[in-house]
UniProtKB/Swiss-Prot annotation:
Pathway: Secondary metabolite biosynthesis
Official protein name in the record: Short-chain dehydrogenase/reductase AacuF
Organism of origin: Aspergillus aculeatus (strain ATCC 16872 / CBS 172.66 / WB 5094)
Role according to the record: Short-chain dehydrogenase/reductase; part of the gene cluster that mediates the biosynthesis of the tetrahydroxanthone dimer secalonic acid D. The pathway begins with the synthesis of atrochrysone thioester by the polyketide synthase AacuL. The atrochrysone carboxyl ACP thioesterase AacuM then breaks the thioester bond and releases the atrochrysone carboxylic acid from AacuL. Atrochrysone carboxylic acid is decarboxylated by the decarboxylase AacuI, and oxidized by the anthrone oxygenase AacuG to yield emodin. Emodin is then reduced to emodin hydroquinone by a yet unidentified oxidoreductase.
MF-aspect GO terms: oxidoreductase activity, acting on the CH-OH group of donors, NAD or NADP as acceptor
């Protein structure tokens, strides 16, 4: 009976992970949410009744330690798979060129992105590592982004979401550092994976956001002419899970791969 912990599990891709994993009654599935009283957290209680949930902000090490003890009680001591999904994408810089950001916004968005998407991931891994060591699968996965691939960014001028993208690139290296430090010697898989291009339900975009999305879609089609539409979140989760289940420390330790298990991002 494998156990999974998904951070950022109250909505979006994190909720899709919980929904898919909990469809197998043999799985022990736990969602980590920042605030159970948030309106975004209601799906955990209202729809996925076989999902456990614990509360912690991933930038708060003390709260994460408390959550780890709660997870230990749920699983009986170990944890098979940790999926670091919680992340922040600052809306002010999502489709604004770097040179058009004010110095204050530039600094704020980079620091916020790195605090959550890099430091928060490190705090989360450290808090749950003792449980991973006692698990069977021993896998620590960080959800990254195709925007974090330098060659793709350079070759196809993907200039959007700069703070988010650089924080995800740093998170990729963080996984490689964990692998270098203890992954190979302890048999723990540390890996970053891009979910691909995924459609996400949201509010109607502004005119500027809509234009930014159109420009990005055109660049992605130049990279992958076969690309016709984003995947649904459910499609992305299924493909990611297949890659994760087949990944090994020997072949994928410290790697950054796509939802296809390679460097083909779409």
């Amino acid at each position: 009976m494998p156990s999974y912990l998904i951070t950022g599990g109250s909505r979006g891709l994190g909720y899709a992970w919980l929904k898919h994993l909990s469809s197998n009654p043999q799985n022990t599935v736990i969602g980590l949410v920042r605030d159970k009283s948030s309106p975004h957290s209601h799906p955990l209680a209202d729809r996925l009744t076989n999902v456990h949930h614990v509360c912690a902000d991933i930038t708060d090490p003390k709260a994460l330690q408390t959550a780890a003890e709660q997870v230990r009680a749920i699983t009986g001591g170990g944890l098979d798979v940790l999926i670091n999904n919680a992340a922040i994408l600052t809306p002010t810089s999502a489709f604004t060129p770097i040179t058009d950001l004010s110095p204050g916004v530039l600094e704020r968005d980079i620091l916020q992105s790195c605090r959550t998407n890099v430091v928060g991931v490190a705090h989360t891994v450290n808090a749950f590592l003792p449980l991973i060591r006692k698990g069977r699968a021993k896998k620590v996965i960080t959800i990254s982004s195709l925007l974090a691939d330098p060659d793709l960014v350079r070759n196809f001028a993907l200039d959007n979401a700069m703070p988010y993208a650089i924080s995800k690139a740093a998170a990729n290296l963080l996984m490689a550092k964990y692998h270098a430090s203890l992954g190979a010697t302890e048999g723990i898989l540390f890996m970053a994976i891009s979910p691909g291009a995924v459609s996400k339900p949201d509010t109607a975009p502004s005119e500027g956001e809509a234009e930014g999305r159109r420009r990005m879609a055109a660049k992605l089609q130049a990279y992958a002419p076969h690309f016709s539409r984003p995947m649904t979140m459910e499609e992305s989760v299924r493909r990611q899970l297949e890659v994760i289940e087949n990944a090994t420390v020997e072949l994928h330790g410290g790697a950054f791969v796509s939802h296809l298990g390679n460097k083909q991002w779409l």
